[in-house]
Structures are given as structure tokens and as C-alpha cells.
Design a protein with these regions (language model features):
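Compact nucleic-acid interaction/catalytic patches
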Residues: 16-21, 27-60
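C-terminal terminal-subdomain/extension
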Residues: 60-112
């Protein structure tokens, strides 16, 4: 069952929608009645602004094959039918940190 905090692999769309590439995504919300959820991109590239590291200690279950970072600046609404596989679940604390970082970005108010 998909829950908020699940890490899943999907064909992630490029910003210009020209193509997709299979990448991990963090579900910020559980899928709704229509199967839609809000997620954040996950990358192995450390150089992006607003990245949050995912350490193994921050995983409730599963593991990512490489050191990975949540892209809090890449938020998407997707459908669960796109999920190729589940790879694990992050702690509720990490998921809430990502949500707070997003809220801070949207409101301009530092997370407290």
C-alpha cells in the first residue's frame, strides 16, 4: 500500500515534457481516491539548491542504490498508475522536513 513517505520509481517527466526517465520520487501525500499524489523528485546529484540528503538512518524500510537527495524545488502531481516499483519509505520526520521546506519556499517564511 502506498503511503506518504514512500519512495517509488516512476518515469519522471522532464520540465519541458519532451521525455521521461525512470527516477525515484518521494510521495508527500498518500494517493487520493483518484490515485493522484503530490511528490518530490529524488536525485543522486548533490549540487542542486534546496536538496535534502536521504541518509540510510532516515529510511524506515528499503534503500536507494546511491547516495540520494530530495529535490524540494521539484514538486509534481502524479498518478499511482505511473509507479514502476516501490523502493522503500523515509521516516515521518524527513517527510515533514521536506514539506516544511516546500512551505517555506512558497511563503518566503523560514521553516521554524
Amino acid at each position: 500500500m502506498l503511503d506518504a513517505g514512500t519512495l517509488a520509481v516512476i518515469p519522471f517527466p522532464y520540465s519541458d515534457l519532451s521525455a521521461t526517465k525512470r527516477r525515484p520520487v518521494l510521495l508527500l501525500t498518500a494517493p487520493d481516491a483518484y490515485g493522484d499524489f503530490i511528490g518530490m523528485a529524488v536525485t543522486s546529484q548533490p549540487g542542486h539548491t534546496d536538496n535534502m540528503a536521504i541518509l540510510q538512518a532516515m529510511m524506515e524500510s528499503g534503500a536507494l542504490p546511491k547516495a540520494s537527495f530530495i529535490r524540494t524545488d521539484k514538486v509534481v502531481s502524479l498518478n499511482q498508475s505511473l509507479i514502476v516499483k516501490e523502493v522503500g519509505k523515509v521516516t515521518e520526520s524527513l517527510r515533514l522536513q521536506a514539506v516544511r521546506r516546500l512551505c517555506s519556499r512558497l511563503t518566503g517564511v523560514s521553516p521554524g
